Amino acid sequence: MQVNELGFLASLLFVLVPSVFLIVLYIQTASREAK
């Protein structure tokens, strides 16, 4: 099965972007509660 590079990149972004967003949101909340 040949992997479509653009499709692979799109799915990678589709997974990474929400994950990074959630991690940043969690860190902001944690640092806010720590103060």
From Swiss-Prot:
One of the components of the core complex of photosystem II (PSII). PSII is a light-driven water:plastoquinone oxidoreductase that uses light energy to abstract electrons from H(2)O, generating O(2) and a proton gradient subsequently used for ATP formation. It consists of a core antenna complex that captures photons, and an electron transfer chain that converts photonic excitation into a charge separation. This subunit is found at the monomer-monomer interface. It is a single-pass membrane protein. The chain crosses the membrane at residues 7-27. NCBIfam families: PS_II_psbM (TIGR03038). Pfam families: PsbM. GO terms for biological process: photosynthesis, light reaction. Keywords: Membrane, Photosynthesis, Photosystem II, Reaction center, Thylakoid, Transmembrane, Transmembrane helix. InterPro entries: PSII_PsbM, PSII_PsbM_sf. One of its GO terms (cellular component) is plasma membrane-derived thylakoid membrane. It is found in: Cellular thylakoid membrane. Belongs to the PsbM family. The keyword Mitochondrion does not apply. PSII is composed of 1 copy each of membrane proteins PsbA, PsbB, PsbC, PsbD, PsbE, PsbF, PsbH, PsbI, PsbJ, PsbK, PsbL, PsbM, PsbT, PsbX, PsbY, PsbZ, Psb30/Ycf12, peripheral proteins PsbO, CyanoQ (PsbQ), PsbU, PsbV and a large number of cofactors. It forms dimeric complexes. This is Photosystem II reaction center protein M.
